From Swiss-Prot:
GO biological process per UniProt: photosynthesis, light reaction
UniProt cross-references to Pfam families, sorted A to Z: Complex1_30kDa
Protein name per its UniProtKB record: NAD(P)H-quinone oxidoreductase subunit J, chloroplastic
Gene: ndhJ
PROSITE patterns: COMPLEX1_30K (PS00542)
Oligomeric and partner information: NDH is composed of at least 16 different subunits, 5 of which are encoded in the nucleus.
Record-annotated membrane-spanning stretches: none
Length: 158
């Protein structure tokens, strides 16, 4: 079943894949990494002016990594704002996804956390560096194939 936003994207010949709806009825779309930035700009212009959250996950050991964006279209006089979930999948060998920091400033720390925990590299992010782990930490702790070190030293926060 195709949702309203998916139908609009098809009408304007924008490449995507509909993944259906979640349990709350929110449409979920898959966008290719190379198309993500231009579609994000279009979604912002279309009225999706609020990035509610961005997160990432490891789909399977040795498999794809996903960056997930929950966007909301907030308008005055509307009781129920429209929401959409966008998923961008990348292989472990090329984890580059365009940053949407310049569209939605709230992506700043969220993209940094996804980088820190899963190693997804957000291109053109102004401060893409570790946010939770020390800079010297080796590896990406939330990847399913991550092997935790036998010993690590707890350091004071900076």
């Amino acid at each position: 079943m195709q949702g309203r936003l998916s139908a609009w994207l098809v009408k304007h010949e924008l490449v995507h894949r509909s993944l259906g709806f979640d349990y709350r009825g929110i449409e979920t779309l898959q966008i290719k990494s190379e198309d993500w930035y231009s579609i994000a700009v279009i979604l912002y212009a279309y009225g999706y002016n609020y990035l509610r959250s961005q997160c990432a996950y490891d789909a399977a050991p040795g498999g794809l990594l996903a960056s997930v964006y929950h966007l909301t279209r907030i308008q005055y006089g509307i009781d129920q704002p429209e929401e959409v979930c966008i998923k961008v999948f990348v292989p472990r060998t090329n984890t580059r996804i365009p940053s949407v920091f310049w569209i939605w400033k709230s992506a700043d720390f969220q993209e940094r956390e996804s980088y820190d925990m899963l190693g997804i590299s957000y291109e053109n992010h102004p401060r893409l560096k570790r946010i939770l782990m020390p800079e010297s930490w080796i590896g990406w702790p939330l990847r399913k194939d991550y092997i935790a070190p036998n010993f690590y030293e707890i350091q004071d926060a900076h």
